[in-house]
C-alpha cells in the first residue's frame, strides 16, 4: 500500500490464501484510495505452510489447516466483490497468462485468484541442520557454507 501511495503505477502483491486471510481488511484501504495494486492470491484452500510443518513434525497429524481439518476459507472472488474490487480466477497454468495480462491492464485494484494444488511442498523451509534448529537465514534446501556466506549481507 505504501509503495502505491508513493506513486508506483503498478504494484504486484503475491500472497498465499492463508496469509491473505490475515490481511484482507487492507482491501478497504486499497479500494478507498483506488490504488493500482494487483493482488495475486496463490490459493491452496488452506494454511499449506502450517500443514507441511504439522505433517513433518507431528507424525502426519494435521489440524486446523483446511476444510477437512476444520477451517473454511471464503471464495476469493466473492471477497473482492464485497470490497467492490474486480477479480478473476485462473484455474490452471494454461489460463494464467490471460488473467495476469488482464490484471495488468487494469488501472484500478485487481485480485487474481490462482487455484493451486492443495499438496504443494513449500520451499525453502526452516528445518534442522546438524541436529539443531537451523537459523532463519539458513533454510532447506541448504546452500554450502561458502555459498551462504557469499550471499549474506552480514558476516556469519
Model feature map: region roles:
Residues 1-156:
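Thiamine diphosphate
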Amino acid at each position: 500500500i505504501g509503495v502505491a501511495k508513493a506513486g508506483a503505477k503498478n504494484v504486484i502483491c503475491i500472497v498465499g490464501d492463508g496469509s491473505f486471510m490475515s490481511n484482507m481488511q487492507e482491501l478497504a484501504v486499497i479500494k478507498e484510495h483506488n490504488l493500482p495494486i494487483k493482488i495475486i492470491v496463490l490459493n491452496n484452500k488452506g494454511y499449506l505452510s502450517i500443514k507441511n510443518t504439522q505433517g513433518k513434525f507431528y507424525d502426519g497429524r494435521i489440524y486446523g489447516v483446511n476444510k477437512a481439518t476444520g477451517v473454511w476459507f471464503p471464495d476469493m472472488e466473492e471477497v473482492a466483490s464485497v470490497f467492490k474490487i474486480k477479480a478473476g480466477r485462473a484455474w490452471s497454468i494454461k489460463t494464467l497468462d490471460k488473467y495476469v495480462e488482464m490484471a495488468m491492464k487494469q488501472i484500478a485494484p485487481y485480485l487474481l485468484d490462482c487455484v493451486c494444488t492443495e499438496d504443494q511442498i513449500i520451499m525453502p523451509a526452516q528445518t534442522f541442520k546438524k541436529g539443531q534448529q537451523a537459523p532463519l537465514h539458513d533454510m532447506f534446501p541448504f546452500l554450502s557454507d561458502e555459498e551462504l556466506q557469499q550471499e549474506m549481507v552480514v558476516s556469519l
